[in-house]
Amino acid sequence: MDYLITAFNRITHWFLTPTNLEYIGSYSLPPGLLRVNDVAVANHKATLDRSFDKYLYEHEINLITKEYRRSPIDEDSILEDFFSGDLPYFEIPFDEHVERGLECMAAAFRPPRPCRPAHILDVKHGYPYKWNVNAEPPFSTDEYFLSQRKTFGEFIRMHEYEHIDKEDFFRRHPNIESHDFLRTVVPPKFGFLKSMIFSWTRRWHHIIKSGFQDSTDLEQTGYFFNRFIFPMLLHTKTAIVKKNDPNKMRTIWGASKPWIIAETMFYWEYLAWIKHNPGATPMLWGYETFTGGWFRLNHELFCGLIQRSFLTLDWSRFDKRAYFPLLRRILYTVKTFLTFEEGYVPTHAAPTHPQWSQENIDRLERLWLWTLENLFEAPIILPDGRMYRRHFAGIPSGLFITQLLDSWYNYTMLATILSALHFDPLHCIIKVQGDDSILRLTTLIPVDQHTNFMDHIVRLADTYFNSIVNVKKSEVRNSLNGCEVLSYRNHNGLPHRDEITMLAQFYHTKARDPTPEITMAQAIGFAYASCANHNRVLWVLEDVYNYYRDLGYRPNRAGLTLTFGDSPDLTMPEMPLDHFPTKSEIRRYHTETHYQNEAQNARTWPRTLFINAPGE
């Protein structure tokens, strides 16, 4: 009954005082809640308890095991987090400072030449997507597409597995010659439905590019009526919190694959240019901790004899408080980073496009505008099946360009605030990645003025953007030592992190089914995450690894994904799993002045496909 009353009140409230989220109906197949194997989690904790008893003090064990917890994945917590984005309308004042912020963002992120789109077939065969993810609506929800799925036998026989991770596939399915397995229908994952998804997406993109004039006999379908804008499923990842703190989670909005693929076409070259040229933009891609990121960042931000202040800001509910009017201005500015007039990115198979015409330009323009239509119109499906549409705020977290979009928005806010404080943003050094940031100002702010300075920033963030600065996690410092970005603090160019919090993350694992193989790989991952700064932490982690090794288990690389995430934007050094790493292996790249992972670069921008480097 409470649920019905809450839902009814939310619907009727919207008509009285329109807020950001509007209920628009229910979906036939809502996303289910992911279940946790409580027995496996208990076994995981028991193994770590055994190692903790050997090497940690009692108060440390109590802090890790009793004072921290992982937020549960339950419907009430998910709905509470989602509806925290039901904000009142806010009008951003586009005065000279916001305009200056947009100008500085454009100058800071502009590539040396406009980037060209990639052809959809080049995206299909060349982009390194995460394949073991949900196919998303309509492919994962609508009966027609679900009924078209192949069996594993057909999938293997037709050689449709070339793109997937073979090691992961055989680990998940060890009995591939079993008749039962070969007759089993593949799950609705992107990798298993790749051919179907790209085939339909190409057809739908053709209709969109024609301005919905060439319907290819689909004009009577609901997909055509909805302009191929499909709803997003709400996926959830939990976080570690103190035992008495409110639940915290990260929601991932499953954007449709036709939308993801279109964004890949438009932004692949631009994204690859940023990754291949760390430091060319404010993006912190290429400054990953384990590759010597803080060492290089320390060099770039160091002031020498001229003292200056440094600023790190933490935003509360950053994505939810991003307003559409500024997002539109940002995206129309970013469009000047692209060109549709030169054809697609030259490949060895198609080095030129001599027949390129204004009609081709217009077709790409329509598809690009359709990606914006998705951004501002696509509804979201909650676990209980209710569908909501955002009216004026919120950046979906599952887009191809989510981290870029967050970074552009974050930089624009920071540059606006600096301008309002009478700084020239382009004379400051601003580094961003999503909602994370570190700034070097052009002057030294006396220590006794730090609180006053932060108060000004808080006020301006609220005045200009209705954004909330988390003052407890934001800092003004007069030394680069001790500054924190990307979860690590700087100690003269070397990264440091609180070891107890890190062990709490390992203990309260995010793995839903932490097998011994997963836990072994996580132990290696956390060893690298520790940066070899804490001997006792390494002893604990190695003890866990050796315990399972002596029982005959071998690490499963999926455990590294749980530790570091699986974003294609993440550059990581190779981490062997056949042994526990030594200190020298962990620290191998910590003092690299110029880190390049050629294998990663080749995946990001395969020169076997493209003629030129990105941005050339």
Swiss-Prot record:
GO MF annotation terms: nucleotide binding; RNA binding; RNA-directed RNA polymerase activity
Family matches, as Pfam families: RdRP_1
Keywords: Nucleotide-binding, Nucleotidyltransferase, RNA-directed RNA polymerase, Transferase, Viral RNA replication
Catalyses which reaction(s): RNA(n) + a ribonucleoside 5'-triphosphate = RNA(n+1) + diphosphate
EC numbers for this chain: 2.7.7.48
GO BP annotations, alphabetical order: DNA-templated transcription
Family matches, as InterPro entries: DNA/RNA_pol_sf, RNA-dir_pol_C
Function: RNA-dependent RNA polymerase which replicates the viral genome.
Name the record gives this protein: RNA-directed RNA polymerase
